[in-house]
Amino acid sequence: MSRFFTTGSDSESESSLSGEELVTKPVGGNYGKQPLLLSEDEEDTKRVVRSAKDKRFEELTNLIRTIRNAMKIRDVTKCLEEFELLGKAYGKAKSIVDKEGVPRFYIRILADLEDYLNELWEDKEGKKKMNKNNAKALSTLRQKIRKYNRDFESHITSYKQNPEQSADEDAEKNEEDSEGSSDEDEDEDGVSAATFLKKKSEAPSGESRKFLKKMDDEDEDSEDSEDDEDWDTGSTSSDSDSEEEEGKQTALASRFLKKAPTTDEDKKAAEKKREDKAKKKHDRKSKRLDEEEEEDNEGGEWERVRGGVPLVKEKPKMFAKGTEITHAVVIKKLNEILQARGKKGTDRAAQIELLQLLVQIAAENNLGEGVIVKIKFNIIASLYDYNPNLATYMKPEMWGKCLDCINELMDILFANPNIFVGENILEESENLHNADQPLRVRGCILTLVERMDEEFTKIMQNTDPHSQEYVEHLKDEAQVCAIIERVQRYLEEKGTTEEVCRIYLLRILHTYYKFDYKAHQRQLTPPEGSSKSEQDQAENEGEDSAVLMERLCKYIYAKDRTDRIRTCAILCHIYHHALHSRWYQARDLMLMSHLQDNIQHADPPVQILYNRTMVQLGICAFRQGLTKDAHNALLDIQSSGRAKELLGQGLLLRSLQERNQEQEKVERRRQVPFHLHINLELLECVYLVSAMLLEIPYMAAHESDARRRMISKQFHHQLRVGERQPLLGPPESMREHVVAASKAMKMGDWKTCHSFIINEKMNGKVWDLFPEADKVRTMLVRKIQEESLRTYLFTYSSVYDSISMETLSDMFELDLPTVHSIISKMIINEELMASLDQPTQTVVMHRTEPTAQQNLALQLAEKLGSLVENNERVFDHKQGTYGGYFRDQKDGYRKNEGYMRRGGYRQQQSQTAY
Amino acid sequence: MASRKEGTGSTATSSSSTAGAAGKGKGKGGSGDSAVKQVQIDGLVVLKIIKHYQEEGQGTEVVQGVLLGLVVEDRLEITNCFPFPQHTEDDADFDEVQYQMEMMRSLRHVNIDHLHVGWYQSTYYGSFVTRALLDSQFSYQHAIEESVVLIYDPIKTAQGSLSLKAYRLTPKLMEVCKEKDFSPEALKKANITFEYMFEEVPIVIKNSHLINVLMWELEKKSAVADKHELLSLASSNHLGKNLQLLMDRVDEMSQDIVKYNTYMRNTSKQQQQKHQQENMQRQSRGEPPLPEEDLSKLFKPPQPPARMDSLLIAGQINTYCQNIKEFTAQNLGKLFMAQALQEYNN
């Protein structure tokens, strides 16, 4: 029966393909009608197929079956559940039962269940073994069934007296039931089959489908094949399937219950099976069609075309033959397609193809660029929509298509300067074909490009960075950049300042992390020939990225009104400066921006960018030999121990438990693609080496000072780890190298230190990663020499009365002026108690270092000071008065504290020296 | 022959080790109500203690032993002693009481005084004011009222003067310990400070006349060089060690005070808060505010830190300070002497 309706609707939908009808017909017009009819129809089939009695009884038998199964596997909990359902179902079937009498099988299950439960109940051993739930269920079920069975006592006793008979009866009854139902089924099937056949013959003859006639066979084929597909995937028709299955089950159940089928019945059953199958197939088909129908009604008729896509490709069948393709028609069509967008069950891939088809048609019919632009916008939007999930990324082919499409769009836009594109153009005010006026199209090229950029990031995030695939994807980066550049050029002409800012930022984001090798090369080779040739060269090679960054960022600084873009631009600018070793510019910009004060209010991606910038800044400072600055810049990132996370270069396993799935997804989305990564080992090495250069002399200078503070906790941690090693082999990892170097430096042995810091292994791991590796290495050697000299002087000054600077300069392979300047500096800073003897070029030590006892006494005094302070605090508390007398005294005490400092001590000592 | 010698002592005179009894009892040390006013130690005991340390004690490790003797009038005579075996990890189940009883029984068989009158302990730079010492001395004194603890300082002895001191707990401290309440209030009530924890009992070393004669003779024969260790001017090591130890104790003291401070703050804060909260609640219910007493029942105040430890630390610091004072005074004396000598020679 359903066949009939399907056919009808089928032909109708087919007819709507003709287009003319559709144009005149309001889209929403037939929206609710047919599905409504259909649903009624569906219900009808069920109601007609089985009588109410059958239906109820089938329900009951089904439940009984599950109960029996549960009984078999001793799942009492399940039994209980099902029993409750059974009771309900029985209640529903009450009216029928009243008419027909209590069904035998019902009595039987009740009796059996009770017996079964009693048996279980008696089986103490088994009960013990049962799990808690089951045991509980058992007792409740037992009580329930006792209560319930009281109503059926007479039936049950009679059943128990004569179980055989009642079983037979039951079987008979079932047979009858199933016969009846199968008969009905048959009837119905007969009809449906007939209708189906009829439809087959009828459909092509429908006048609206004339144009499909030739393709009929093909069409059918495709439909069939699709049927198979549906069988496999079942995604679209899963609902119908499950329903179907239920029906099947009931039918089967009734059949299974047959005890002794006669041959006749056997045949019938076989026949029925076949029919069933056929019916099912038809049903499914009809279901699918129905669905399509629904979708058609929802979003234009195009879904129907899906079946004929290959066909359509060969011959555009978007519009009926002979239809005059006008703007109105095309736009109408477009709207229809777009309405399906975002709806469930819309085949997005097909939608895209359809749109592309539409472009083709529009192009073929010379509908003007406006329409094409419009459609293109929508194609790109659909491409973006293709993935329903935000986390998943575009497939490569989609991505390729998207890039092509944007390129084409840009081509058109460049070729036709009279097209205005904008977000703020309303649909109504669009002008797609009136050639007299400038064309106006709604849509924002900038948003598209931004989205494209996001998609690109997503693709990069989701590709294994060590695979060839990543490289392949990375090649698209050039294309992305090219597009951004084009859009930039376009927007520079037409866009508002805000838009320009946004596209500039995009450009910046694709520029800032790249090291400009060309510019670097140019810098390295000083102008040889005339300035003119150099200029030519520069022109040939295009703009320096530095100049480009400068230009873009300045524009943003000046014009941007949203804080975020400016912040990002500044950070990128700093990063770029730092990357190209323009330390002072980078630092000044960082300080001027005051970003350090308020970056914690920014959103996480900006914070990640900030962290990246700081790290780059630190590395830059290191390259310049500014160890202290490098250390300070890297301190925040390194001391947390979460550099990886802070730089957005990976998630920490440790905190994995702390966050839920949602957060993790969010964090994953924040990750920086691999090609932007900053080498973490390099980062750590730079940090540790700069910490070493600072810390080792400091440690040597304050060896006996109780108030000595650590400059770098992390460095100390590494040192301690190194010390804990029971057996010290030659260093393997970068950290071990640094630790070994630190130890050498502590002894003032700069040569060993040097060999630990700069060797083959470390070169490969770290130093070669710098663009100017050799320069860095020379800087590093010099730093090591200087700091070793300082350490040496701190550590061993007490054993020297005087030392010749020449000796020192030989020892550390530094030239005399450098040694002189280092020592002078130390003397000025009161780090070294010595004086320089100019004529002999020697350092004369002053024996003013406190002895061990003096040091101890100083420490003791300090400790006592704090003790007194603590004591006073207790006293304050007792008194309940903060401030007052003791407060004053405390301040006084603090004033005196100065004498404990080394400088003060020395002064005192020099006064009392004899 | 028991000579008393003050710490600031002219070192040159009391050179003989046996003669150098280290009874530096301060005036307040002897308490009037105790039966024992003086401790008389046999030379044998002193030698045994020294020998015990030399054979078994090393560095910071301490040696301990039992003192035997008897009380005669107001005098505690220590006539013999025996050492405790050193504790090692292996014999954790070693029964000390059993060992003591057996030792004493055996000694009785050879007619040696077997009255348990206390115990002795070696010390490392005078760091003996500890909880362990307090506890065991308390149990001794609890059982035998007269018992004392002899503290032997091997390092000082090595510098030329025997250092042996007898201590016992003051009656006040005994009472506090009996009650086992070391809360700040209890200590305040007992009016106990670190100065009145231990009292030193003056000691006298007694030898038989024959031995005394021998001593004189030995002294005559001994070369001058044997006595020179007393004149050593090297002071830094000892002083440094003492300072280090003192510093550690000061650190502990600081921590203790901080702990106490936090406790005080917490208590007052809690009291205020809880009081306010409770009263607010009561007010909202229209009840009169709670009286103070109920409050402490309602809310358990934070556990007050035991103050005994800080008392002990204070006592220890005091000892160190005494030590350092003594030592520096002696050394200054030596320095001046050396200077004078040099001037004289020149």
UniProtKB/Swiss-Prot annotation, chain A:
Location of Phosphothreonine modifications: T525
Protein name: Eukaryotic translation initiation factor 3 subunit C-like protein
Compartments where located: Cytoplasm
Annotated GO biological process: formation of cytoplasmic translation initiation complex; translational initiation
Functional note: Component of the eukaryotic translation initiation factor 3 (eIF-3) complex, which is required for several steps in the initiation of protein synthesis. The eIF-3 complex associates with the 40S ribosome and facilitates the recruitment of eIF-1, eIF-1A, eIF-2:GTP:methionyl-tRNAi and eIF-5 to form the 43S pre-initiation complex (43S PIC). The eIF-3 complex stimulates mRNA recruitment to the 43S PIC and scanning of the mRNA for AUG recognition.
Bias (Polar residues): 523-532
Keyword Methyltransferase: no
Region of interest (Disordered), residue spans: 1-44, 157-302, 523-543, 886-914
Biased composition (Low complexity): 8-21
GO molecular function: RNA binding; translation initiation factor activity; translation initiation factor binding
